[in-house]
């Protein structure tokens, strides 16, 4: 009891001087703006909005950013919302009118006490937001319904993304099935965030809600120069980390050691976190496609497979490599390694304008079958990358430069 009381007194003695301070003065416009960035720049994100508006003849386009996190985790924005705004702050909404070209950014009202805990947050009172983002109309989130009432009196269509919301380490091919399983659960049954939004819009405003995802996916599939640069930087960070992991491999260390090493190198090289969980499989664990435990010690006769990549400026990379723990290949290891390397080379050779992802898949599979390894093909050999590690895009669509 005495120890507990003493601990409380110490905590209070540390806290009281802070509590006695006057509220911190509001940051100046210059200093607040200096702490913020707008994704890949206002020109990039503004260009994405303009292109999307040019693909729609009429109606409103509504996109909601993610709310605050439920846990003590760093906030990460929904990929689609970030693509269109560059805003990495919770509680934001984007509304656009295809007919007039009007673009409105809605942000939460100022909450100074919250900023004392979490630092500068974007809100409707920040004078620098418009200059930084390119938005000429920034309004409080509390006015969203009022503006929707005004605009839906003139148009009866609202376009939204029904693509499952994903933030860091998220992919549509995981998020979509998760939402469907939860909706089908008889003891849960919750609709996805996107479905709930569609239902609310229909009920409140009597509008037709249409998906805009086809247009968004076409845009996201073909990368701009800014996106290619971000992906190259992510790839470089991932490659440096992979080389460090290979150099550090030896019998007796844990899979967790390579996991931690790569995560550290990713961040040292500018990454903001993992594009997906680390897959560090040694020995028998290397055969588990999405192994995540990282709990085994490496042994001298093992091959180790490492599949890990960072996210950098919201763009991902995906690198997989295998090597012997001892540093020397056995004849069988070399045979398998060479087969995979040959399949990879065939796949790269099949990548060309006008070709498809399906063509690349067939080229890789053909080599493996010729090497007698056809029965081991359990998954695809390639996929799009970009904002999501498994990025959007139809595999039958012709590839473009």
Where do the model's predicted regions map?
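Bacterial N-terminal signal peptides
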Residues: 7-17
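Active-site neighborhoods and metal-handling regions in enzymes and metal-associated proteins
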Residues: 3-5, 18-401
